[in-house]
């Protein structure tokens, strides 16, 4: 399947996309050359043969793809700011009017981070400066492309020692582009006491919370996310259907699922038959969910690809797409006033309320 053609031409909201999984291949090549970092190819086509894929792999093999290109980006100030800026430009071209992009500040740093990621030598780019650079890139992109962009800082399941700093950065930049905390990585690793403490502090300080859960892992991981970590949204969450009682409860409370159809196919999170995808059940039950790209670089995709899949295989209509995006806006981590402005933008574009101008 190729990148999608536009199937829904109205404004869209995207809540689940990883900054380090959404870098332009041209940008990777530029910084690889500039910094003398070897890459598995010297052209976009060659690079993409190693970085992206189109038939299902395990989540573990998918995660190994990052090793091919992250050394060209991590630890470089210009690169970090630029990938954030370019993401906003890409989303604007896709018709997204609001995006929440997530990343681990530690995985883009090379100083005051233990261990230093991607085999880098120690440098002078700290996790906090990474947050500042991403904020700059997002804010410059907002100004130039006239969409709204906010960020979510990720704790990593395999690195609980980073989590205390992640929540402190969320607190410090809470009113400056950062809207939430996330927990990502291998779901086989249960949330450690450090992750739990970080989420407790986030809740205490009014920081929004989402958790990757029930993607490759079982429904018990969603229980952990909701009841232990007090998640307000679930990243993926497909395996919630294995626990009907939990599913009914989350339907009742309008828990939001950040669904990524093409990703769920390529990581083997779901059965390869899209007609049996959990989203079919979510749609039938009018659950609260959004449609997102996750890692469009590695999946060689864009938002139209995911919209195309649910239209072709799950019979999504224009009205379904409108409902999904209104759900996304309502479940966004924007402050209430900005959330209402976003909803009004969608209502007006969708012809659901008369224009007030």
From Swiss-Prot:
Presence of the UniProt keyword Aminoacyl-tRNA synthetase in the record: no
A Pfam family per the record: A_deaminase
EC number: 3.5.4.4
Cofactor note: Binds 1 zinc ion per subunit.
GO CC, alphabetical: anchoring junction; cytoplasmic vesicle lumen; cytosol; external side of plasma membrane; lysosome
Active site: 215 (proton donor)
Positions annotated to bind Zn(2+): 16, 18, 212, 294
One Gene Ontology MF term: adenosine deaminase activity
Reaction(s) the record says it catalyses: adenosine + H2O + H(+) = inosine + NH4(+); 2'-deoxyadenosine + H2O + H(+) = 2'-deoxyinosine + NH4(+)
GO biological process, one term: hypoxanthine salvage
Known cofactor(s): Zn(2+)
Topological category with respect to the lipid bilayer: Peripheral membrane protein
Chief location: membrane
Binding site for substrate: 18, 20, 185, 295
Keyword line: Cell junction, Cell membrane, Cytoplasm, Cytoplasmic vesicle, Hydrolase, Lysosome, Membrane, Metal-binding, Nucleotide metabolism, Zinc
Site residues (Important for catalytic activity), renumbered to this chain: 236
Tagged with keyword Membrane: yes
Intracellular or extracellular location(s): Cell membrane; Cell junction; Cytoplasmic vesicle lumen; Cytoplasm
Function summary: Catalyzes the hydrolytic deamination of adenosine and 2-deoxyadenosine. Plays an important role in purine metabolism and in adenosine homeostasis. Modulates signaling by extracellular adenosine, and so contributes indirectly to cellular signaling events. May act as a positive regulator of T-cell coactivation.
Family as reported in the entry's similarity comment: Belongs to the metallo-dependent hydrolases superfamily. Adenosine and AMP deaminases family.
HAMAP family: A_deaminase
Name the record gives this protein: Adenosine deaminase
Organism, as annotated: Gallus gallus (Chicken)
Protein encoded by which gene: ADA
